[in-house]
Amino acid sequence: NLLFGQGTRGLQRYAKRGYGVDLTATEAERARTAFFRAYPGLSRWQAETRRHAERVGQVRTSGGRVRALEGQRALATESLNTPIQGGAAECLLAALAELNLDRWNAHLVNVVHDELVVECDPEPAGAVAAEVERAMVAGFLALFPEGGTRDLVEAHRGPNWAAAKG
């Protein structure tokens, strides 16, 4: 995707495969331009991260984990993917360390990418959802203390995971 340095052709393929939308090269390029205009800091970060990766042959996550990069493909994709995906994984690990479900007899049953799946009785579900949101925000702030948290986390509830995902 665009966060990881996707080009015009990649965006065309992504729109088609993911959403059934056919974009011309011109439309895809306009969409890319609009995206980076809306988030000017992102293109600067991408350029700086790639330059640094080319210079030192590695990239770091927010938590300090190092990934060695070998080859042009790694420099083009992994140099951007690792800090984002690795940082997200570190935030989730920090959230897990923060999470306290004991008082509600709630149980963590699955961790999927950026989601925590928790089972509990219906009565405390609102309080459990609030605790999950609190822990996830705390996990994010542990790595990005200056980061904005508005609309960062959104808990969903339902009788099962599929229903909660809506």
Model-derived features with residue positions:
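Conserved catalytic core of nucleotide polymerization and phosphodiester-bond processing enzymes
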Residues: 1-166
